[in-house]
Amino acid sequence: MMRYLYERLKTFRGGANFAMPGHKGRVAFDFDLSDDWTEVTGADNLLNPKDVIASAQEEIAAAYGVDKSVLIPAGSTTGVKLALYLAAEPGDKILIQRNSHLSLFHAAVELGLELVYLPAPVDEATGLFAGVDPADVEDALAADPAIAAVFLTSPDYFGGGLRLKEIADIVHERKKVLIVDEAHGAHWAFTPLAPYSATTCADYTVQSLHKTMAALTGAALLHMNGPVDERKLLKGMGLFLSTSPSYLLMLSSEYAVAAGKAFDWRKLLSYRKHMEESLPTIDVAKERGNLIACADPMKFLFHVPGYRGDEVVSLLAEKGIYLEMGDAYYALAILSPYNSEEDVERLIRGLKALLEREEDMAPPKGAYPKTEAVYSPREAFFMETERLPLRDAKDRVAAENLTPYPPGIPIVTYGERITEEVIRAVEGSKNAIGFEDGKVTVIKSAW
């Protein structure tokens, strides 16, 4: 049998990695395959922890300064579902950002949740989401007291953090629950950005340790503050997690938190400063208005004049330099403690080698089109469907997410109408999941 995946991944060895995972293939873990166990006597059980796993979770909670932490060796996607299961009941309304991760929309299908959208302002200078206005949260909760919880993403994929403490005060004053997808900020609690971490103010915080820290891909955490229904928590873990959770993922989670606490994260600031000073003609996205409280310097989002971002990604990959993502305008490099000075120099040399083109392009006018929800995600998911060419699907209702990946934010989700704006956004994306062979899935017409 040909080992296709293995042979392909071997070609990436020796590259300069500015993508996930945060360990960059360089962490000398102090565990190995001999530690890959299941729930044998003495190894405890994640689905009913009473011994070493319970102790590990207590230690992690103390490191993050939260009341309780749970190991999630199944990615933040599972952490999101578990948090929503704990915070809401079927039929409940959840106030969300439209630029939420795909996992939230999947959770809405599985749990039967109704989604209420916050306004999604866009920064005119960068074309990126401009954050969440605390006043919009207050207005939405006042207008609809039936909303059970607020679900926010902070930091976002590009490293922008929300004004979470202000928002948390508003949410808690109205006796609602605040859930934060902090998948991209598991390291924040150990950096100068600690005051902006959701762990300081959210009821539930979901983190992906592997994105920026020394954990294996799929290692995640769910943090909780305040009272926890232990019976419901165990029930939810049994529902969403495998009965054979990976001990290697859990071991890497322990390792990552310990290493994250010990690392001097300010070291990465010098890398970032050197990159910006060495590349004066590169357009680096920074400020996004006063609704973004802080920006993570580990996320180096930039535009090379004259080039699409996905073009930059491809050209650098030919040189063994791997970026996290590229779209029609931007490219993204993610720094971590395991990038070397030589990595940074290779990236700088690679970008300098790209010849500037005389004709440049304008930043995107808006990150995602405005959409109209016709059905709830769960209703749309189970309706009869058909596949149509994208252009023929105008004004029809989507039965699947159309999602550029990365970052995994749907252009349109289950139950939303496909507009001309949606069509143009999908056409502009080269890697939208759900858009195969030029066709999309829509709810079947009665006519």
Where on the chain are the PLM-derived regions?
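Short, glycine-/Ser/Thr-/acidic-enriched flexible segments
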Residues: 25, 157, 211-212, 227-229, ...
